[in-house]
Amino acid sequence: MANLWDERAERYRTSAVHAGGPDLDLVVEWCDVERGTTVLDVATGGGHVARRLRELGAQVVTVDRSPGMQPDVIAPAEHLPFADRSFDVVVNRLAAHHFDSIPEAVAEFARIADRRVVVEDHRYTDEQTEQAEKLRDPSHVRSLSEDEWRSLLTAAGLEVEHATVYEMPLEFEDWLARTDTPEADRPRIRELLAPLSSEDGSTWLSPILIIGARRP
């Protein structure tokens, strides 16, 4: 799997969807950092969260299981090589649906965070949308509902502070190209996502959950 993400690394570093947007602004706001705040950015991908937080003076360590993403530390989200409560904030953006075990990853986030955890990911919509996501990208494991996220964070000993859903517009051609989706699969994906698509079929709206929790 790491080799797959090594191949995709540059596309995610330059992806406009990942590099900006009101969702990224909100994630940064909810991290609530100041100069010297320590942050662990898990599954950093293109490093966009880390860049924004560093601009605010935070001390950010990035971790990703893919060497091609050029993280500070190479490790999966489920097994993070850091001490308990060793970072003020743990943040994870647009990656959890690829994790082998989201519950294990959330337990790690809660173990390492001294203050809060902020997560952004595609929210579960229905099985039809999940089918489209997996057809587009076999590394997609599963998206969770807001209730599932709340339950996991609470079970890990955290208190949910904020939660909101952002409807992220995704251009089909760009979205499919980013994962080298075979041309033969693209019509079926468009068909599955028709209920969420624009009238002209050029884009679709993906519900994105942003949720923040704190240590009591």
Q: What positions do the PLM features span?
A:
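Conserved Class I S-adenosyl-L-methionine
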Residues: 46-48, 161-216
